[in-house]
Regions:
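Contiguous, structured surface segment used for ligand recognition
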Residues: 26-149, 477, 488, 504-532
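Flexible, acidic glycine-rich loops studded with aromatic residues
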Residues: 370-375, 380-534
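Bacterial Sec-dependent N-terminal signal peptides
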Residues: 1-28
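Flexible loop/turn segments at secondary-structure boundaries
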Residues: 59-60, 162-164, 190-196, 258-264, ...
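Feature activates predominantly on carbohydrate-active enzymes
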Residues: 94-317, 358, 362, 475-480
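Active-site neighborhood of glycoside hydrolase catalytic domains
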Residues: 264-269, 279-399, 404-413
Length: 534
């Protein structure tokens, strides 16, 4: 009853503020703040906003006010503190990325301890501004806000289908508005290599192209016959990194090792175990091609790639993939079998653990942290994997595990071992599981994820008592199979991404699905205007 009363009291206050401002509706806030106290009255916005900020925020304040002016049409100027009606102050007691926002009838006060906190305060402020009948105002309110999780991520797979710079920037804009802060960029896979590596130009010249694309579904023999290409130059990537940084988004690149390697092996056949020349696959699915990680030349290649990627991306974290490795080619390779014998490895699963530790150690020496899908821990999580003896252990010291597949007990065991974890449990966070929305009646093999289920997701599962502080947060994933047009991607991403944004930001005790649906209306209007949803 208390929750219901608070919900309707909040809506009444919003409605009252709207009436004071002369309108009939008022935009709610999303993701919802973790502490909010609505107060009577409104702050009426003059045509010329007078702004003061502490020197700590000088550059950030300029950027957020420019953006606010661009999006609302309001003008502003910086003034002395005594003359200001919007004041931004450094407040060391505010949590990282958090902010305070106090709006009275006479002024707006913002407090933050980080540049990101000021940025997020501005995003909230933009949602509070109401225009009606020629008037512009903000309801009086006190907000003390901070994220539930430090990692609030979105994954875009461009290896399967290249989207391009403009689309990536649009996604980054929406992530920023939703206070999401990690863009996980899946740049290589069987169907394409999308990042320029200067030392190995064939990765993009050959691996960045394919002759056609499979249509309908995995078992289909129908192809569109249209060549596909596209990749990012290193200059393109620097531009996108800078664009993301302006929005307080870290880009974590993913380069797939040792599986999902067909595009790379098509470019340089000596990277593989079979010795055969292959083409970049035109179909989707899990392929057998894997890197011959026992070959010194292949190890050098991998280090060279990681060197260029590490130099290019400021992110402390480099994602090495590691998922869905089929062991057939390793088991059939004399070189691999001898290497396993020399290294006293009992199974292909132990070989993968050895390789992950090798990459983790190398990246550590470069000042980077390795991240990989939870396959790298050696747990059996796929039906196609044989039962393997596993006595080796993945080193916890420089490794983040991204959990996507398996039961909660596997996640619990991973945390018990001391790994930091990002939770991307596929049955809750995969945006592509809703593909039947685009093609009605499609037999995908996965249960679609309705909005309410997405919203119910908790990065720390209920009943999991083991070291919840090691759960950094979540990443929702837009995998790229069948997403050959941006319009399809929009339909998959929006509005579902908003649920994951609130999962990452709003504490469980402050979540309310009915209230969330009301808050979502403002973003739906924004996305309709942009042409993302109907």
């Amino acid at each position: 009853m208390k929750t219901i009363r608070l919900k309707y009291l909040t809506l009444l206050v919003i409605a009252a503020a709207s009436l004071l401002c002369g309108g009939s509706t008022f935009a709610a806030i999303l993701p919802y703040p973790n502490q909010i106290e609505w107060r009577p009255g409104v702050f009426r916005i003059s045509e010329d906003l007078r702004v003061y900020c502490d020197s700590f925020f000088k550059n950030e304040a300029q950027k957020v006010m420019d953006k606010l002016s661009e999006e609302t049409g309001l003008t502003y100027r910086f003034v002395d503190k005594k003359d200001a009606d919007i004041l931004a102050s450094f407040s060391e007691n505010v949590k990282p990325e958090g902010y305070t926002l106090e709006i009275s009838e006479s002024e707006v006060n913002v407090g933050a301890s980080t540049q990101a906190g000021l940025f997020y305060a501005a995003e909230t402020l933009k949602q509070l501004i109401q225009r009606a009948n020629g008037d512009c105002c903000i309801p009086c309110v006190y907000i003390c806000d901070f994220p539930a999780f430090s990692w609030r991520g979105f994954l875009l797979d461009e290896a399967r289908n290249f989207q391009g710079k403009a689309e990536v920037k649009k996604l980054l804009d929406e992530m920023a508005a939703l206070k999401m802060n990690v863009f996980h960029w899946h740049l290589t896979d069987d169907q394409g290599w999308r990042i320029e590596i200067k030392k190995y130009p064939l990765l993009t010249e050959v691996g960045g192209r394919r002759d056609s694309t499979q249509l309908n579904w995995y078992e289909s023999c129908v192809y569109d016959g249209k060549p596909v290409s596209g990749y990012y130059t290193q200059q393109d990537i620097r531009e996108i990194i800078a664009y993301a940084a302006d929005r307080h988004i870290t880009i974590v690149p993913e380069i797939e090792f040792p599986g999902h390697a067909s595009a790379a092996i098509a470019a340089y056949p000596w990277l593989g175990c079979s010795g055969k020349e292959i083409s970049v696959p035109c179909s989707y699915g899990v392929f057998s091609s894997v890197f011959n990680i026992a070959d010194v030349r292949v190890q050098t290649f991998i280090r060279d790639v990681l060197d260029e990627v590490s130099d290019l991306f400021p992110s402390e974290i480099i994602h090495i993939g590691g998922d869905e490795v089929k062991y057939d080619e390793w088991q059939n390779s004399e070189t691999i079998r001898q290497f396993m014998k020399d290294e006293h490895l009992l199974s292909p699963a132990e070989l993968q653990i050895w390789f992950a530790n090798y990459l983790s150690s190398y990246l550590s020496r470069k000042g980077k942290v390795m991240m990989g899908w939870n396959d790298i821990t050696g747990d059996k999580i796929h039906a196609f994997q044989p039962e393997c003896k596993v006595e080796s252990r993945l080193d916890t010291r420089n490794t983040i595990v991204q959990f996507w597949q398996g039961n909660p007990e596997i996640l619990g065991k991973t945390l018990e071992r001391g790994f930091k974890v990002v939770n991307s449990q596929c049955d809750y966070t995969y945006l592509n599981y809703n593909y039947d929305k685009i093609v009605p009646g499609l037999e995908y093999g996965h249960t679609p994820i309705p909005m309410e289920k997405a919203y119910s997701f908790s990065p720390v599962p209920q009943g999991l008592e083991c070291r919840p502080e090691l759960v950094l947060g979540l990443t929702c994933a837009m995998w790229g199979e069948w997403i050959n047009r941006s319009e399809i991607m929009y339909r998959m991403v929006y509005p579902q991404i908003a649920a994951y944004a609130e999962v990452g930001w709003t504490l469980n005790e402050n979540k309310d699905f009915d209230r969330f649906l009301i808050s979502l209306n403002g973003f739906k209007e924004r996305w309709r205007s942009a042409g993302y949803i109907q």
